[in-house]
Amino acid sequence: MIVGIGSDLCDIRRIERSLERFGERFTQRVFTPGERARSDRRAARAPSYARRFAAKEACAKALGTGLSQGVFWRDMEVVNLPSGAPTLRLTGGAAARLAALVPPGHRARLHVSLTDDPPLAQAFVVIEALRDESC
């Protein structure tokens, strides 16, 4: 069953301006070390950061909290599955909120779609609760 859906559209130029103006102060506040390493390896850093920014916003919406109620930017990390598909690793307040959304006897699966077509980056996050067969 679907327990949360979120989407976000991010202007890549806005992220580019934040990178130019605030540099590491911006990236360290919003992104995990792993996300920074992946984005900083790219020739075009801004689209990579913008996709991740949009994913975090979409995730916060899917959790039903936005960036409040103990959910912080770095509680949500865009990572890749072995297949290369993006997903999110949640910690802290985001993980606690996810646990509260998922009914007993179920486990969460996060579906993430990321894209960019300059000047925009977009993300969709769907939180699915699957029956846990081990219960």
Swiss-Prot record:
NCBIfam families in the cross-refs: acpS (TIGR00516), pantethn_trn (TIGR00556)
Protein name: Holo-[acyl-carrier-protein] synthase
Lineage, uppermost ranks: Bacteria, Pseudomonadati, Pseudomonadota, Alphaproteobacteria, Hyphomicrobiales
Cofactor: Mg(2+)
Entry's localization field: Cytoplasm
Family recorded in the similarity comment: Belongs to the P-Pant transferase superfamily. AcpS family.
Catalyses which reaction(s): apo-[ACP] + CoA = holo-[ACP] + adenosine 3',5'-bisphosphate + H(+)
HAMAP family tied to this protein: AcpS
Biological process according to GO: fatty acid biosynthetic process
Source organism per UniProt: Methylobacterium sp. (strain 4-46)
UniProt main location, coarse: cytoplasm
Functional summary from the UniProt entry: Transfers the 4'-phosphopantetheine moiety from coenzyme A to a Ser of acyl-carrier-protein.
Record keywords, A-Z: Cytoplasm, Fatty acid biosynthesis, Fatty acid metabolism, Lipid biosynthesis, Lipid metabolism, Magnesium, Metal-binding, Transferase
Enzyme Commission no: 2.7.8.7
Gene transcribed to yield this protein: acpS
Enzyme class, first EC level, given as a word: transferase
Sites where the protein binds Mg(2+): D8, E57
